[in-house]
Amino acid sequence: MLKEGGLRVAVIDADRIAQGVSGHTTAKITSQHHLIYHYLLNKFGQDNAQIYAHANQRALSQMRSWITAKNIDCDFTEASAYIFAESEADVDALRQEVDAAQALNLPASFTTETELPFPIKGAVCFTDQAQFHPRKYLLALAREIDGDGCHIFENTRALSVSEQSRCTVHTATGAAISARDVIIASHFPITDIGPFSARLTPKRHYAIGVVVDEKPVENMYISAEEPIHSIRTYETDTENILLVMGESHRTGEVIHTETHYQRLIDYAQSHFGARDVRYRWSSQDLQSVDKVPYIGRFSPTSRHQYTATGFRAWGITHATVAASILADLIQGKDSPWHKLYTPARIKPVTSAKEFVKHNIHAAKHLIRDRLKKREEGVESLTPGEGKLIKVNNQNVAAYKDENGNVFTVSATCTHLGCIVSWNSAEKSWDCSCHGSRFAPDGTVIHSPAVKPLKKV
């Protein structure tokens, strides 16, 4: 959007384009974001709820238009999006959601009939939604950016951003990029040392791709009940693949993460008769304390730094919403959606409970985890195991690989100093406070940390 507006743009990525979270989603292009609209009407009022609904419906239309106009081959298909309930206890919530969505002019209806191969008590149906292959789509857009004075720099990690009359992005290579405006779209803003730390919760989500004999569904589904399961299908040249995502938890809260994959496999087998597991992966996203993303100027004092974060696992349409809002602001235009999404908003009644809960949690990990008793030495480590130990009264993250090599690094996250914990399935050190993740040798996998864990 900025390039089309005549601006020169540079995109920098610590890894490769579409290698991270955006390339590993279930890729539903929909304004149906689970049970959200009844909540928005109650907490934000009619006008703001209407903004959320319209913005995401408009994002769906915009993406459909881009894919058609640019002839992007990304397996785009039209589909309906359903929230379903297997329990009678959740039906009232579904009916409330339908009423709210219809009041906001969304294409919603209640039904008791779906193509799911198991009985349900009811479902919310949004028609005229879509699904696609996110990586194919993102790489096509990236090709549109590069050229005519615009650039993409991959494998370039930003360390910090300074702002005066212009902004300077400082990178890990020592190079610096000067720009009038900078958008920090690193999930958790890498430059934040204050407001976002208290208002964003990192969540991990798990996904599997399993083989099914026949394609069980044409549309997209998500369960109303906890644990939430998100469902869609994908066809290869030779197989029908059922994608199931769910079993979410706060980052760094679970050590034996392998159990979450097994629960997804059990669900796919019991509900769909799934066979072999072809793919498995995990992803991460952030949730704001009031469930609405933060999109706009980084802080009230920032003139040229912007951010987009807190998508609550609904980043496909919200990324396009963010692009529209930020393109308008940077070009000096009014954005009709900004008043809802602005990071400067204050909704004390809406978010107070989650705000307190989040910050008690962070404080617990910042203080209590430092004082825990831990065994000393690495003698008890088995191959493939990671464990927190004490060395000279310091918390150390120790890992033994399959060849018996031991890696020891500081257990103190380089972002804001919380203690990391071991993730057995991904073999990583994860920070529960703000979502940073590190490889066994301390290398940064996921921001907001930009520096590795110190070697010990």
Feature names for model-found ranges:
Residues D92-A93, D99-L104, A123-D181:
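Helical element adjacent to the flavin cofactor pocket in flavoenzyme catalytic cores
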